[in-house]
Amino acid sequence: MANSIQVREVSAGYGSVQVLDRISLSVSDSETVALLGTNGNGKSTLMKCIMGIVYPSAGRITATIDDVEHDLCGLATEDIVALGISLVPEGRRLFPRLDVEENLLLGAHRRAARAQITRNLAFCFEMFPVLAQRRKQLAGNMSGGEQQMLTLARALMTAPRILLIDEPSVGLSPLLVIHTIDKIRELKERAKLTILMAEQNFHQAIRIADRGYVIVHGRMEYEGRSRDQLADNELVRKLYLGM
């Protein structure tokens, strides 16, 4: 059954400050779409709009979950999660004084997820063996790379159909960035997820993205319908390749 997102002409901001200006994008079933842009251009704000954390001032956001379309605008975040959409936030935002397993179990608050806790936990430990090895270790005592794995796994505990991933490479060493991006690709293939990933690391994002968008100063400036189109675009070369 199909799971997708449509963002149509969305504007949003904080108080009198407008951050997004008539943004449109789509993520089709089982796609990985990269939302590319440097810091401060609105990527995280768009993610928050989809999750009901920030309310758009204009436009429409819909999600198709198991072939049923839902209007997300005006829904509370917990209701959006209950539909089957989960966010991996920038900065990880774990509970540092809880251990690995406790952090994971907190992710299983969606009704469908509660019914599958044992299976979901086993899948997370299979995907991320280091978490199984450290299931009783406090999250605050883990390395940055391990915390990023835990954040991804916690989102999986909600049994999502659609996964939003915000800046997964932030604060990680180059080697850990490669490992994290590889894990996201593996997740997509094994869990059949629809993924929207906001990322400023262009080179890593296009390794796994089916296509992508470039956001500049809150406006969608370019849509690349393939990896090759993204890499060959003049705006992308200027922003990311210094050409």
Task: Kindly give the residue locations of the regions a language model identified.
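Conserved structural motif at the start of ABC-family nucleotide-binding domains
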Residues: 5-7, 20
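ABC-type ATPase nucleotide-binding domains, specifically the catalytic core motifs of the NBD
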Residues: 15, 33, 75, 100-119, ...
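The feature captures the beta-strand-to-loop junction immediately N-terminal to the Walker
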Residues: 36-38
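Helix-to-loop junction immediately C-terminal to a conserved catalytic motif
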Residues: 51
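ABC ATPase NBD Q-loop/coupling interface
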Residues: 60-81, 226-227
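Conserved ABC ATPase signature
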Residues: 138-142
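ABC ATPase C-loop
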Residues: 155-156
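Helical segment within the ABC ATPase nucleotide-binding domain
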Residues: 178-192
